[in-house]
């Protein structure tokens, strides 16, 4: 049962996007009202499901082993497994690839409809999905910042998937410290055209044979650049030159110097690249060139970075889902030991054992909580673009910015924990590579590392997002949790609301403690940043899960116990109860630790780490 059998289920996905989120509000916006009704998403989801089941997941076996092969050479350094070609072409031809990122297209889909498509694709093959998702992010930067001439030159073939795209940020000496990039760009006699010289590493989809050209977005500094991130520029550097008419030209002196041998996502080509080894690499500046050594590259790249951080959470969500469904399938079949309540009885399927049920419901609750967080954030992002009222657009943009680090860090952290629980459900077989959870655990670990490690996300959340615009957006974010707890109480969920009320009081104390530390001992904010991000995530996920449970209870009452959907809604209610009563209490532990404010990790001499 290697991860080549697609077990994903769509019922909760459709509940989230069709029943729970206010899709009528979004689809009434000018961008969508003449094109889509709420049921139109079914066709996209159903086609995507078939592609995932019949094409992507079967191809995933070769994605993991043998994966991509590095052969070197200037023109084609990486060979992908043969089955990748059909998978890549099928996705692009079905309109399920980089086309999503074209926000200027007439009749474009909402981003919140993209979320389940990416989730299911990642759940089918975490490796293969990277080949078109990085292209989509690169398109976003070009679309929003480049000249019309450059858009016309590059975007059509990138959107179609004929050309791929990358984000050329990381260097051997510049990982999280982006401002340390050493790659240089030298102006030429042609305005906007620069000669490129430098090295990049860990470049996802840096070279492959699925696209005829790779368009790299490269961060680089001019010789007179200001130090740090303010001196960074972003340039379009194609592997093969692109002529003015959009045709492909000669090799542009972009060399693949090696492929990384990774723990997971073996089917994703992660490369080291060298630009200008022969002094003949050129790229186009995106937007205006630098002024007095100050570039706009970081601001431009962060448009792609924020998109990819949200997508990273969605990729992690796919691994959570596939690992859970693999564990569930196994636990329904595996027979071992009598029930605890009938020790002399026959052996039963392990799903009947208490601790196995706990592990399964933990995974299910994490899957549904993280899905609610992700989809809500995509929904906010859509409204930040498409709502008619400027004040409303600003509000939803603020909410999106606050939640992106939660989506990236919390979901990817929980993917690692949840896939571990899936392995545990399988017992010794979970440790065997022929079973899906082992590969999914290896594959999902990257998500807490790339697009800014999860501590970077925690820094961003606690030091930027909570204080932006004098803290007003964060106050509104907290207030919407308070408003929900004050106005939505239901006697059927009295215990859950009581738990959330207590956790919310604790979270407010966490926030006030953090603000006091900011003034008196900011190093403590760094020390507790990750735990505070998790506390915020548990609070918002608890609220979202309880909101879904209220809707599920209402639907169940309307439909009755005999309805075919009754078990789904009962599962929604039980899963929300579990999350609120078993996961949300983690907020109390964070507050207790913050009250103690233990600084052992800071105080211990380096020499004592032995």
Curated annotation (Swiss-Prot):
* Transmembrane segments annotated in the record for this chain: none
Q: Does the keyword Metal-binding apply?
A: no
The record lists the catalysed reaction(s) as:
butanoyl-CoA + oxidized [electron-transfer flavoprotein] + H(+) = (2E)-butenoyl-CoA + reduced [electron-transfer flavoprotein]; a short-chain 2,3-saturated fatty acyl-CoA + oxidized [electron-transfer flavoprotein] + H(+) = a short-chain (2E)-enoyl-CoA + reduced [electron-transfer flavoprotein]
Q: InterPro entries per the record?
A: Acyl-CoA_dh-like_C_dom, Acyl-CoA_Oxase/DH_mid-dom, Acyl-CoA_Oxase/DH_mid-dom_sf, AcylCo_DH-like_C, AcylCo_DH/oxidase_C, AcylCoA_DH/ox_N_sf, AcylCoA_DH/oxidase_NM_dom_sf, Diverse_Acyl-CoA_DH
Cofactor list: FAD
> According to its UniProt record, in which pathway does this protein act?
Lipid metabolism; butanoate metabolism
Q: What SUPFAM superfamilies would the database entry show?
A: Acyl-CoA dehydrogenase C-terminal domain-like (SSF47203), Acyl-CoA dehydrogenase NM domain-like (SSF56645)
Q: Which GO terms describe its biological process?
A: butyrate metabolic process
- The active site annotation covers 451 (proton acceptor)
- Which UniProt keywords are listed? Cytoplasm, FAD, Fatty acid metabolism, Flavoprotein, Lipid metabolism, Oxidoreductase
The Gene Ontology terms for molecular function here are: flavin adenine dinucleotide binding; short-chain fatty acyl-CoA dehydrogenase activity
EC number from the UniProt entry? 1.3.8.1
PANTHER family named in the record: ACYL-COA DEHYDROGENASE, BROAD-SPECIFICITY LINEAR ACYL-COA DEHYDROGENASE FADE5
Q: Tell me which family the UniProt entry assigns to this protein.
A: Belongs to the acyl-CoA dehydrogenase family.
Q: What does this protein do?
A: Involved in syntrophic growth of S.wolfei with butyrate, as part of the butyrate oxidation pathway. Catalyzes the oxidation of butanoyl-CoA to crotonyl-CoA. Probably passes the electrons released by this reaction on to electron-transfer flavoproteins (EtfAB) to finally generate hydrogen and/or formate.
- Indicate what this protein is called per its UniProt record: Butyryl-CoA dehydrogenase Swol_1933
């Amino acid at each position: 049962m290697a991860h080549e059998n697609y077990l994903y289920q769509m019922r909760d996905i459709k509940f989230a996007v069709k029943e729970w989120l206010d899709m009528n509000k979004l689809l009434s916006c000018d961008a969508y009202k003449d094109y889509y009704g709420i049921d139109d998403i079914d066709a996209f989801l159903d086609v995507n499901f078939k592609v995932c089941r019949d094409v992507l997941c079967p191809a995933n076996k070769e994605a993991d082993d043998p994966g991509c092969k590095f052969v070197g050479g200037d023109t084609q350094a990486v060979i992908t497994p043969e089955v990748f070609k059909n998978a890549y072409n099928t996705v692009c031809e079905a309109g399920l690839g980089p086309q999503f990122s074209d926000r200027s297209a007439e009749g474009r889909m909402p981003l919140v409809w993209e979320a389940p498509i990416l989730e299911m694709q990642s759940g089918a093959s975490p490796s293969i999905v990277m080949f078109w998702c990085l292209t989509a992010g690169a398109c976003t930067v070009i679309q929003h910042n480049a000249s019309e001439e450059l858009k016309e030159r590059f975007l059509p073939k990138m959107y179609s998937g004929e050309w791929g795209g990358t984000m050329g940020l990381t260097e051997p000496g510049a990982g999280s410290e982006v401002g340390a990039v050493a790659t240089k760009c030298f102006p030429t006699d042609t305005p906007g055209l620069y000669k490129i010289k430098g090295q990049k590493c860990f470049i996802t989809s840096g070279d492959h044979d699925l696209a005829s050209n790779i368009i790299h977005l490269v961060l680089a500094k001019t010789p007179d650049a200001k130090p740090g991130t303010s001196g960074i520029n972003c340039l379009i550097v194609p592997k093969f030159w692109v002529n003015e008419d959009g045709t492909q030209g000669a090799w542009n002196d972009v060399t693949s110097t090696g492929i990384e041998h990774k723990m997971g996502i073996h089917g994703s080509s992660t490369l080291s690249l060298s630009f200008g080894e022969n002094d003949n690499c050129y790229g186009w500046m995106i937007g205006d060139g630098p002024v007095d050594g100050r570039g706009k590259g970081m601001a431009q790249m962060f448009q792609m970075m924020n998109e990819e951080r949200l997508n990273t959470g969605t990729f992690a969500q796919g691994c959570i889902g596939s690992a859970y469904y693999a564990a569930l399938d196994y636990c329904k079949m595996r027979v071992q030991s009598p029930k605890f309540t009938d020790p002399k009885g026959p052996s039963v399927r392990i799903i009947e054992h208490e601790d196995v049920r706990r592990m399964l419901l933990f995974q299910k609750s994490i899957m549904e909580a993280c899905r609610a967080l992700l989809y809500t954030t995509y929904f906010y992002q859509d409204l930040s673009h498409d709502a008619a009222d400027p004040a409303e657009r600003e509000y939803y943009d603020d909410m999106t910015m606050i939640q992106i680090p939660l989506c990236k860090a919390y979901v990817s952290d929980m993917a690692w924990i949840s896939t571990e629980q899936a392995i545990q459900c399988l017992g010794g077989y979970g440790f065997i590579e022929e079973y899906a959870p082992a590969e999914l655990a290896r594959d999902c670990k990257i998500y807490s590392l790339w697009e800014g490690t999860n501590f970077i996300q925690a820094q961003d959340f606690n030091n930027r997002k909570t204080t932006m615009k004098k803290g007003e957006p964060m106050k509104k974010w907290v207030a919407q949790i308070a408003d929900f707890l004050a106005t939505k109480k239901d006697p059927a969920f009295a215990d859950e609301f009581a738990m959330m009320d207590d956790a919310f009081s604790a979270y407010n104390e966490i926030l006030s403690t953090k603000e006091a530390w900011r003034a008196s001992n900011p190093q403590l904010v760094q020390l507790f940043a990750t735990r505070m991000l998790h506390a915020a995530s548990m609070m918002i996920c608890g609220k979202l899960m309880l909101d879904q449970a209220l809707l599920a209870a209402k639907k169940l009452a309307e439909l009755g116990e005999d309805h075919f959907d009754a078990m789904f809604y009962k599962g929604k209610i039980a899963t929300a109860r579990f999350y609120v009563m078993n996961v949300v209490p983690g907020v109390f532990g964070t507050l207790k630790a913050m009250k103690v404010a233990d600084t052992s990790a800071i105080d211990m001499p380096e020499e004592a780490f032995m």
